[in-house]
Amino acid sequence: MQEKYHPQEIERQARQSWQETNIFNVTEIPDRPKYYCLSMFPYPSGKLHMGHVRNYTIGDVLSRYRRMQGYNVMQPMGWDAFGLPAENAAIQKGVPPAKWTYDNIAYMRSQLQSLGFAIDWQRELATCDPQYYRWNQWLFLRMLEKGIAYQKTQVVNWDPVDQTVLANEQVIDGCGWRTGAVVEKREIPGYYLAITRYADELLADLEKLPGWPERVKTMQANWIGKSFGVDITFPPDTASGMPQALKVFTTRADTLMGVTYVAVAAEHPVALHAAHNQPDLVAFIESCRQGATMEAELAVQEKKGMATGLYVLHPLTGERLPVWVANYVLMSYGEGAVMAVPAHDERDFDFARQHSLPIKPVIRPENGELSVPLVQAFTEYGVTFNSDRFSDLTSPEAIDAIAVELGQKALGEKRVRYRLRDWGISRQRYWGCPIPLIHCDSCGVVPVADDQLPVVLPEDLVPDGSGNPLAKTPSFYECTCPRCGRQARRETDTMDTFVDSSWYFIRYACPDQSAAMTDQRANYWLPVDQYIGGIEHAILHLLYSRFWSKVMRDLGLVSFDEPFANLLTQGMVLNEIFFRKTSSGRIQYFNPAEVDVQHDGEGKRVGAVLQADNQPVESGGIGTMSKSKNNGIDPQEIIEQYGADTARLFMMFASPPTQTLEWSDAGVEGAFRFLKRLWRQVYLHRQLDGEAAATTTLVPHQEYPADLRDLRCQLHQTIVKVTDDLERRHTFNTAIAAIMELMNELSDVQGTHPAARQLMQEALENIVLLLSPIVPHICHVLWRELRPGTELLDQPWPQADDQALIQDEVEIVVQINGKLRGQIRIAREADRAAVERTALQDEHIQKSIAYRPVKRVIVVPGKLINIVV
């Protein structure tokens, strides 16, 4: 065994051994428990970042741990390979997106392999592979047959930078999720998936997911947004020119008698009708199209509106109510119209005050009066007043009574509604899965036949950055109609890339199946036992995947209800941000590796300078590693300098996996020093013992010297703790800390006493086993030194020795007059008299007693002694 730890050499040796034996390739074994561990697959952007390293190391630790427990473990890997970044890179570099993507995949695969992940590479897939996306197309056609997929024209979210439609879930704070551009509203035809058909099941089945974070389940429940209310029809005041009745949905029918106006969305047909001869209203409607698109954003933006001059009638009183166009009304929720009750809704209150509209209170607190005039809306349930025949009812009673009368007048009925909207999947871009439809002037929309799938993208196309590239490529869109044989045109929209990631985890189970989308192997491996990824995917990917799985279940393709049994959402990786403001006002960011932090004589930080010019830079504090802030750390540099095991160890030790991790160069150095110390400890042990031998019971536990018995007890306590940390809590940092504490104690074991050598062998073997899921390369090599002729990956997870856990001595708490004054250690089997004698003879206890007479002594065996003075 060499004396020095050379990580690159031993890591290459370990990986070569794993590759030669295909040790991580798995098949179905019915009589063994399976464990499917999956980290969300990456977009092949070109290089791994530290977030990837953290994500995949978490999954690898759990996979290796379960493998040692006897599970049949599958940990696959693939590439979420479609998407706009490839198109944009192709535009900049003048190369086809396919080449850019596959080149990136090759490099990132080599990076993943250099990190030593226990991946079954025979299952690798890329979503841009026609043999993968043919099944997107096949399932889309099945959805079309079932009415789950359909076409409609609707006002959509339009990203002006990427020039494509975005789903509601892809609009964040009014901006595109990828570009950050302010989203516009446009009326465009497209294809939709009826996820709303599954809204009730998607909501109810959250109860089947105890292994998911409550925060994620709450986010999904709120997004689905089930609400109980009443559909109410406001008849038109035809004398005002109102062309139609207005239907609204409200959860607060108890406030109906307080309605003072009705507001409609800018895209509502009534708004468009009213705008015909009102240029100001036309301009206002256009400005609304550039505004916010989500409820949360609308709630906080300035409330703007214009009167239409049209009126509707109150359904119960017949009162004329003005119709306004308001920027806080969403066309996508309910009917695109709201009944406005300023006294009892904050948005309506703000709007009414701004436009001098009446405010009529009709609900007061159950135990008190309402202070009038209102200074803010009273939005709670209460008791009705000023409501004619519906006065003096509780809010629930009033809702029921008003719903009954509306029903009798055929002007309303109780309804359940959802915030969730059907999923628009049409994208006006090239690098995505083609929608398998043909447009024929004679036959209409015709599905591509199953035996003609996949509709393949032209992979040599280089986009020019304007419009939809496929719509400008005759070789792609020109075709003949499969029904009538006349000239026709292929659909040139492609599918939202979230379609690709909505079922990839199922395809991993049967990637070589060419005759079907899936087979029975999926029902062996699924659901995923442990899924790992960022909380930013709580609504988008995770909700879509749950929906897709349920559709596949209903089509008989899989047998499970939920795809992910347990979910771990890892925290972000953070690093310091350094920048300068240029003379033009632009902010220029510098990588922390290019900056020297300065300290004074007492070690206090006083500033930072750029290495290139020795001039000051400002600190922007700690933030998520990102390209835009130039504060990322290249994993490859860490691997080349310290080795993959050091990177893995730091990532697992620096923070619990669900919390943010702050990058620390000193922390990386510390991880490297620990691995060098582990290597040296095994080296010294091997030098002392000559040829290492397997642990044998040369010295029974009870014959160990007392100090070695205590150390062996600590060893087996560490096994218990590390097992619990990995099994139940996933707190890898505390598991590593316990192993480090044990290592510190081992350094005191000296000499050639058989018990000492035996304990050192046992301890080092178990430390290597416990650490092997976290730092597998070094452990692979050290195991061969400790147990020649055996392989670490053939070993089971360590089991604690119950006999070793029995301590010879126990710690007894000592109280004086009921107050804690110290502890004593005493033989476990000591009788009451011995406990009392030891406590009274303790130097610190004697000082606390201060020669006061002892009245009595209370002993609780094995726990405490209370001396009454």
Swiss-Prot record:
Positions bound to ATP: K627
Main location: cytoplasm
Documented EC number(s): 6.1.1.4
Source organism: Nitrosomonas europaea (strain ATCC 19718 / CIP 103999 / KCTC 2705 / NBRC 14298)
The protein's name in its UniProt record: Leucine--tRNA ligase
One GO process term, biological-process aspect: leucyl-tRNA aminoacylation
Record motif 'KMSKS' region, residues: 624-628
Any Pfam family the entry gives: tRNA-synt_1g
Family note: Belongs to the class-I aminoacyl-tRNA synthetase family.
